[in-house]
A protein has these predicted regions:
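General helical secondary-structure elements
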Residues: 1-2, 225
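Bacterial N-terminal signal peptides that target proteins for export
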Residues: 2-12
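Intrinsically disordered, low-complexity Ser/Thr- and Pro-rich stretches
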Residues: 5-7, 17-18, 29
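Bacterial N-terminal signal peptides
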Residues: 11-22
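Sec/Tat signal peptide C-region and signal peptidase I cleavage site
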Residues: 24-26
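Glycine-rich phosphate- or other oxyanion-binding loops that anchor nucleotides, phosphorylated ligands
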Residues: 28, 32-37, 60-265
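Short, conserved "active-site rim" segments that organize catalytic pockets and cofactor/ligand binding
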Residues: 34-54, 76
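Nucleotide and nucleotide-moiety/phosphate-recognizing core
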Residues: 57
Length: 265
């Protein structure tokens, strides 16, 4: 009788362990199926149309930023305006990761062209990002290199890059898309001198003010990311006029591409 009881207890324990294992696997599957995409823009023009398209929208205000959760064309997303600059972008990215548990991040918005072949209205999809204003060269570091980290560039996720290029072709077929380095810094580039300095020091296809900070935080947290930027100006002496004239149209184009990308994950 004792042997039968022991055998029964053993069977029960094995069944419970199998159920626990099955539940864990199912939970993992659910997490993957309901995974969220964080979408960050610095300005209203870059995120407003995405926010307006959200279904089942829920808004949380954290650190002065409005995080809008919801469904975007069937995908779970969190859309947020981080504000201008690298500090805002970095703080926003960490909140998306910690509070909203996003599994990937898209940075959408506008940028200035650093390449003569890239014109206003074109799209740049990041292969990597660098901070052009990180300058500790006086201590022997390369321009853009972050001291004690050994890092200066942060590679974008290859699968996300591929989907971004596909999204450009589908959502904006008349737009030219380029893949390459995005250079970020807390400067609004509006002169040939500034532009030439960036090109000669760290290079890049375009310049803006948030992408590399988002990339660095994503790298620290092992979260895949991609930066998608529509060109609104040439980052030179014609900056002010072209930026004001084209920023809204460029941002809307980029938002449409981002929307297509999350809907076809």
């Amino acid at each position: 009788m004792m042997k039968k009881r022991k055998l029964s207890l053993t069977v029960i324990v094995l069944v419970l362990l199998m159920l626990a294992f099955t539940s864990t696997c199912f939970a993992d599957t659910v997490v993957k199926e309901t995974a969220k995409t964080g979408i960050i823009g610095a300005m209203d023009e870059e995120v407003n149309s995405l926010k307006e398209a959200l279904e089942e929208k829920r808004v949380s205000t954290i650190a002065g930023m409005e995080f809008c959760e919801g469904r975007l064309d069937g995908a779970d997303v969190v859309v947020v305006k981080c504000g201008v600059g690298k500090v805002n972008a970095a703080a926003c990215t960490q909140i998306l990761i910690d509070r909203f548990e996003v599994d990937q991040i898209i940075n959408t918005g506008v940028a200035g062209s650093l390449d003569a072949a890239i014109d206003i209205g074109d799209i740049v999809v990041s292969t990597e990002a660098v901070q052009h204003d990180m300058d500790v060269t006086v201590l022997g570091y390369d321009r853009g290199e972050i001291p004690y980290s050994g890092k200066s560039v942060f590679p974008a996720d290859e699968e996300m890059r591929t989907r971004a290029i596909e999204a450009v072709k589908a959502a904006a077929p008349k737009v030219h898309a380029f893949e390459g380095r995005v250079s970020s810094g807390d400067q609004f580039i509006a002169s040939h001198e500034q532009k030439d300095s960036i090109i000669s020091s760290v290079g890049g296809l375009c310049c803006e003010m948030e992408g590399a900070a988002i990339a660095q935080v994503c790298s620290l947290n092992e979260i895949p990311f991609v930066i998608i930027r529509a060109i609104s100006d040439k980052a030179d002496d014609s900056e002010e006029m072209s930026y004001v004239e084209f920023v809204e149209a460029a941002a809307e184009n980029c938002a449409a591409i981002t929307r297509y990308m999350v809907a076809h994950k």
